[in-house]
């Protein structure tokens, strides 16, 4: 009986701690909507730059938004032409048509960066000179 009472108190304490920790972690990062990030962005590496249009038009997959741009430049940057993108709480992911990630761009103080195992680094940033609704 004493063990059962102690166990219930301990389980309640653990549940309280997890709810506090989980609640603060969940509220620290916000998932932006596609409409907040849509528009023309500049994608670049050390050799090339191209404009990419992030839209708020969903692909048939449902959780991915369409992406448009210069197919030759995009194929050079990603190894294939990406079809879409999706926002994440700490960046954005460029995807193929099925939603598989081709690159994750982490939102850092100096910009949005994707780093690859082969040492390549891509940067993407909003094009401030273009209209949001293009």
Swiss-Prot record:
Coarsely, its chief localization is periplasm
Q: Which organism is it from?
A: Photorhabdus laumondii subsp. laumondii (strain DSM 15139 / CIP 105565 / TT01)
**Which residues are connected by disulfide bridges in this protein?**
50-73
The positions making up the signal sequence are 1-26
Instruction: Quote the protein name from its UniProt record.
Output: Alkaline proteinase inhibitor
Q: State whether keyword Disulfide bond applies.
A: yes
| One Pfam family of this chain | Inh
Any Gene Ontology CC annotation:
periplasmic space
The record's comment on protein family reads: Belongs to the protease inhibitor I38 family.
Where located? Periplasm
Question: Transmembrane stretches, by residue range?
Answer: none
What's its job? Inhibitor of the alkaline protease.
Q: For this UniProt record, give its keywords in alphabetical order, as a comma-separated list.
A: Disulfide bond, Metalloenzyme inhibitor, Metalloprotease inhibitor, Periplasm, Protease inhibitor, Signal
* InterPro entries in alphabetical order: Inh (IPR022815), Inh/Omp19 (IPR021140), Protease_inh_b-brl_dom (IPR016085)
Q: Which GO terms describe its molecular function?
A: metalloendopeptidase inhibitor activity
Q: What is the lineage of its organism?
A: Bacteria, Pseudomonadati, Pseudomonadota, Gammaproteobacteria, Enterobacterales
């Amino acid at each position: 009986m004493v063990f059962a009472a102690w166990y219930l108190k301990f389980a309640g304490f653990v549940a309280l701690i997890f709810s506090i920790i989980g609640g603060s972690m969940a509220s620290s990062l916000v998932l932006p909507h596609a409409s907040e990030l849509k528009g023309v962005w500049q994608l670049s590496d050390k050799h090339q730059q191209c404009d990419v249009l992030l839209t708020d038009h969903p692909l048939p997959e449902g959780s991915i938004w369409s992406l448009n741009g210069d197919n030759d430049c995009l194929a050079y940057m990603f190894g294939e032409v990406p079809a879409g993108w999706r926002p994440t709480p700490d960046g954005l992911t460029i995807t193929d048509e099925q939603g598989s990630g081709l690159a994750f761009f982490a939102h850092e103080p100096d910009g949005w960066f994707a780093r690859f195992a082969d040492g390549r680094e891509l940067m993407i940033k909003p094009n401030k000179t273009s209209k949001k609704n293009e």
